[in-house]
């Protein structure tokens, strides 16, 4: 966020106000996770990767699909679940078919039921979100509500608050980098659990907390204004 402001020429002071998340903190039960695996025919033990967002190329879905191809070619077992819809959905599906990864990638379409969506978050081993377009990676915080860590591009807005291997995982904006990170962490359940818990404790914020933070900041601005000579003017 700060880098985006600097790029357009803003050099003043700033305070970043975090977006809140409407999903509560939730630990999915083993039965919830088994339900998702049964629904999509995913055997127990195979790592589940997740993307949630609009089906648009600017979300770097090409990087995700190319990474899936690299993982398949290397012999890595996994399933990538892609949740969302959008005007480029058909083109994205055709590209996945062209890469011959239809046995590894599952397109669910849009999921409007927020409780169902949260079960997907909680079932996944990791969220894969290499978008550099988003000014705030809300899905990263949604995943954190279920203690699911995210892979994000270093120095992107989505990476704000992410420390590599502590509250998430950082990659370069390339399919090879994404594939390399996935392959390195997919079987390390202890690492995924620890980083997921850290994400929940450090980057998750509820809307109530976000509103309280914004309210306090506005109050500070109002108090500062009232303490200046401007308060002598009556409007």
Q: Residue locations for each model-derived region?
A:
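Carbohydrate-associated surface elements
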Residues: 20
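Conserved acidic donor-binding segment of nucleotide-sugar-dependent glycosyltransferases
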Residues: 164-165, 169-175, 184-189
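A short, well-ordered alpha-helix in the C-terminal region of glycosyltransferases
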Residues: 191-205, 209, 216
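Aromatic "clamp/platform" in nucleotide-sugar-dependent glycosyltransferases that forms part
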Residues: 132
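Short alpha-helical donor nucleotide-sugar binding micro-motif in glycosyltransferases
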Residues: 110, 118-124
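Conserved donor-binding/catalytic core segment of Leloir-type glycosyltransferases
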Residues: 43-59, 65-68
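Nucleotide-activated donor-binding/catalytic signature segment of Leloir-type glycosyltransferases, i.e.
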Residues: 93-111
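Short hydrophobic beta-strand element within catalytic cores of glycosyltransferases
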Residues: 149-153
């Amino acid at each position: 966020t700060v880098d985006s402001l600097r790029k357009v020429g803003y050099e003043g002071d700033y305070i970043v106000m975090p977006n809140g998340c409407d999903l509560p903190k939730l630990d999915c039960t083993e039965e919830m996770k088994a339900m998702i695996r049964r629904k999509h025919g995913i055997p127990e033990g195979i790592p589940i990767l997740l993307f949630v967002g609009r089906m648009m190329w600017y979300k770097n879905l090409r990087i995700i699909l190319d990474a899936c191809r690299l993982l398949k070619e290397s012999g890595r077992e996994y399933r990538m679940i892609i949740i969302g819809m959008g005007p480029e959905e058909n083109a994205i599906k055709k590209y996945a078919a062209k890469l011959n990864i239809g046995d590894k990638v599952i397109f669910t379409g849009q999921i409007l039921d927020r409780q169902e969506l949260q079960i997907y978050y909680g079932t996944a081993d990791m969220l894969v979100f290499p978008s550099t377009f988003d000014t705030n990676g809300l899905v990263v915080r949604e995943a954190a509500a279920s203690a699911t860590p995210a892979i994000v591009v270093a120095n992107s807005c989505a990476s704000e608050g992410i420390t590599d291997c502590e509250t998430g995982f950082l990659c370069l904006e390339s399919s090879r980098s994404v594939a390399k990170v996935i392959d390195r962490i997919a079987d390390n359940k202890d690492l995924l659990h620890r980083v997921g818990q850290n994400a929940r404790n450090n980057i998750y914020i509820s809307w109530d907390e976000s509103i309280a933070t914004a309210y306090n900041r506005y109050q500070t601005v109002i108090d500062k204004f009232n303490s200046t000579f401007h308060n002598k003017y009556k409007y």
